[in-house]
Every structure is written in structure tokens, then in C-alpha cells.
């Protein structure tokens, strides 16, 4: 029996190559399909209209291949589900995915799942599934009613805030932790404190702020984000977080990333990693790309439903110039915040080879690094810093 026949039977084969290092793959089972009509969405409307759901054969081949491609020493394999709105794939789709994960998971390997949703379609059945299988949930909510309904309406232009809040309340009722993802653009740049306060008021303990950067040909007229506004917004969040005494109580991923990267030399975010290319994305038809922000022919790696193993496709992504040349510019090399910035996301680099948010990152990172520089960049340094912070808080 040859390799193609074994794949057809969905049997893991030891002869398949494994990746040299763990890699992540973000899956879009419904592609651009969504029940909201966010005014800044980077998916063109025509792409949202022609999307289709991933079929069961491709789902099975992907799960089998993704598990088989990870290094033998991997002790956890994470599946990331995103959209569009991934809940549109239906609860049965994820039940099948979970069954396939159990079927192909090697002994001693933990399988985990993360899913990003707008929260409006959540119900008790979804929450029971997520709770039972320990899903890590992200919920997209840009702010209070005024902000959310203005920038993230439904397909008919109507309000979405109440539906999103109902979804969040369900997660809390089922005792499911969630990360609140908020998009930052010039239209909300002067509302950082109010947006932070609202997130905390609705019970969110894990927050993440994502800069809006226009990509492709999406109809995002009137939206943008200047470097100055990005830096101003994040500095305001940082100061609010400190002034309210939320250290150790509310976790802002943009802040935690700096702390982690300073003391461990490793970034939890591909945006600020020294190299990227280890976070692939798969469309519902099986096309694999090197990055969620680089969905174009230049960064197409291949197809998951064809005969090239995923480990081989992942190796191609790791060797692409965009991931290796992030911070090679002379200005980056001598920048005082390079250790936690690393040039930012390559998709946000302009024709002048500067990251369009450079000045904002510099202002934000400089403020966070100032009190850290007195401590060694080591686990021991982290312990000393935490002790000092605790003493001050006490």
C-alpha cells in the first residue's frame, strides 16, 4: 500500500516527514463567512458572499496530517479556529473535529482548541461543548454600545452589541474564561480609558488590543490607524491598567507580551517574534498560506488536500523572506526597543521598509521597558521584578 493510499484511509504514517519545530495552523472552516458586517473588515464583500464550509473529507485529512506533522517531542498540539465567524460551520462540524482529534492523537499528547468568535451566535449548547472540551475562547467586542454598533453592525446595519453581550453572559454562566479582542483605529484613539473600563466592567480579565491595518482590497474607506494614535492609545491603556491597580488581576496581552519577551527572550506573539513563519492559515478549500495577513499568490504554500505533507509546507513558510528579514533594517538593529519589537508584523511594512506603526510601538515599548531595565533578562530577573511590584502594590 503506497503513501497516497494510506492518506486516503486517513491512517497516520510513520514515514511522513515531521516538522523540525512545532508550528501552528489557523483554520477558517467557513472562510470569510460572517453574520456581522464590520465596517473595517479586511475581507472584500464578494469573498464573503462566495465562501463555503470546509467539507468533512478535508477536515479529516487536515486533522490527521496536522497531528502527524508535529515533532515527536510535542506534548501539546493546538488547533485554532477562526473566520469570518467560525460558529457558522455548525456545532456538528466541531463535534466531528473533536472525534477526529481523539482518533489521531498519539498517547501522551494533549490536544487543545482555541476559537475566535463575535459572540452573537453563542447558546447553551455551544457553551457546554466548549466547557466540556476546554476550548480557549476569544470574543471580538470593540467597546461599549456606541463603539460596537457604529463599527461592528450586523449585515443589515443593525446593532450587534446586545447579542454580543448575551454571548459573553453565557460564557460567564458556564464559567468559561475568554479573551476580549478589541480593534483599535483612529476613530477610537481618544477613547482608550473608556474602552478599557468597559471591558473590565463586563467581567473580562484577559484583554487584547489589535491595531487596524488596511490590507488587500477590502472596502474599509474612512478607516485607518496612525502610528501616533496607536502609541497614544496603548499608553493610555497601560496607565489606566496601572492606576486602577489591576496588575495581576487583569491581563492585557499587549503588556504581558512585553514582560514575557523581556525576561524570557521569547515572544508569545508572532508579531513581535524575532522570526515568523510558524503560524500558517488554511482556507476552507484547503489552500495554505504563510500568514493570515498575507493571503496572496506570493505566500501560497500549497493545498492540505493534496499530496505534499504539512511538514513540508510549514518548512516553506519558515524559509520565506518575510519571516526572516523582520528586523534587519539598520534602524531596527540599533533601536532601544528591538528586544521586544523585532520590527512588528511584516504585513504592516510600507514601501520605505518601515513598519507603519513604528513610532507608536516605540512610544509604548519605551514606557514599559523603562522600569524593567533595572532587572536581568532572565527568570531570576522576572522573580525580582515581580517581588518589587508586589511590594509596591502592598
Regions found by a protein language model. Give the residues of each.
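Short, ordered coil/turn segments that flank beta-strands lining enzyme active or ligand-binding pockets
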Residues: 284
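N-terminal [4Fe-4S]-dependent radical SAM core
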Residues: 1-27, 72-73
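Flexible mid-to-C-terminal extensions adjoining Fe-S/redox cofactors in radical SAM and related proteins
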Residues: 295-394
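Cysteine-centered iron-sulfur cluster-binding motifs in ferredoxin-type domains/subunits
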Residues: 30-37, 85-88, 276, 332-334, ...
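Radical SAM enzyme [4Fe-4S]-AdoMet core and its adjacent flexible, acidic
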Residues: 150, 154-162, 169-276, 281, ...
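Radical SAM/AdoMet-radical enzyme domain recognition
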Residues: 63-80, 89-212
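Canonical Radical SAM [4Fe-4S] cluster-binding loop centered on the CxxxCxxC motif
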Residues: 20-57
Amino acid at each position: 500500500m503506497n503513501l497516497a493510499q494510506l492518506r486516503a484511509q486517513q491512517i497516520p504514517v510513520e514515514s511522513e516527514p515531521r516538522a523540525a519545530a512545532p508550528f501552528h495552523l489557523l483554520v477558517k472552516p467557513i472562510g470569510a463567512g460572517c453574520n456581522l458586517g464590520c465596517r473595517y473588515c479586511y475581507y472584500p464583500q464578494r469573498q464573503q458572499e462566495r465562501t463555503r464550509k470546509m467539507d468533512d473529507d478535508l477536515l479529516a485529512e487536515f486533522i490527521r496530517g496536522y497531528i502527524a506533522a508535529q515533532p515527536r517531542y510535542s506534548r501539546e498540539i493546538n488547533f485554532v479556529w477562526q473566520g469570518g465567524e467560525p460558529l457558522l460551520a455548525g456545532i456538528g462540524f466541531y463535534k466531528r473535529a473533536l472525534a477526529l482529534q481523539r482518533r489521531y492523537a498519539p498517547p501522551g499528547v494533549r490536544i487543545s482548541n482555541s476559537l475566535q468568535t463575535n459572540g452573537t451566535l453563542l447558546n447553551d449548547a455551544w457553551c457546554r461543548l466548549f466547557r466540556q472540551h476546554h476550548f480557549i475562547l476569544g470574543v471580538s467586542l470593540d467597546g461599549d454600545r456606541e463603539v460596537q454598533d457604529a463599527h461592528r453592525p450586523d449585515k443589515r446595519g443593525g446593532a450587534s452589541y446586545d447579542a454580543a453581550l448575551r454571548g459573553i453572559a453565557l460564557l460567564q454562566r458556564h464559567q468559561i474564561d475568554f479573551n476580549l479582542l478589541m480593534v483599535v483605529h483612529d476613530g477610537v484613539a481618544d477613547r482608550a480609558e473608556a474602552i478599557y473600563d468597559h471591558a473590565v466592567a463586563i467581567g473580562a480579565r484577559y484583554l487584547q488590543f489589535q491595531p487596524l491595518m488596511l490590507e488587500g482590497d477590502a472596502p474599509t474607506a474612512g478607516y485607518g490607524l496612525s502610528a501616533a494614535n496607536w502609541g497614544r492609545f496603548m499608553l493610555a491603556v497601560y496607565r489606566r491598567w496601572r492606576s486602577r491597580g489591576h496588575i495581576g488581576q487583569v491581563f492585557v496581552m499587549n503588556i504581558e507580551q512585553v514582560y514575557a519577551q523581556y525576561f524570557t527572550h521569547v515572544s508569545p506573539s508572532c508579531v513581535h517574534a524575532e522570526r515568523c513563519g510558524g503560524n500558517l492559515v488554511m482556507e476552507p478549500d484547503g489552500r495554505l498560506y504563510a500568514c493570515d495577513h498575507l493571503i496572496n499568490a506570493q505566500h501560497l504554500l500549497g493545498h492540505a488536500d493534496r499530496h505534499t505533507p504539512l511538514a513540508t509546507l510549514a518548512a516553506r513558510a519558515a524559509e520565506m523572506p518575510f519571516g526572516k528579514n523582520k528586523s534587519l533594517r539598520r534602524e531596527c538593529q540599533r533601536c532601544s526597543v528591538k528586544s521586544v519589537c523585532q520590527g512588528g508584523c511584516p504585513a504592516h511594512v510600507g514601501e520605505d521598509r518601515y513598519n507603519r506603526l513604528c513610532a507608536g510601538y516605540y512610544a509604548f515599548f519605551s514606557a514599559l521597558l523603562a522600569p524593567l531595565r533595572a532587572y536581568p533578562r532572565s527568570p531570576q530577573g522576572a522573580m525580582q521584578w515581580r517581588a518589587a511590584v508586589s511590594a509596591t502594590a502592598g
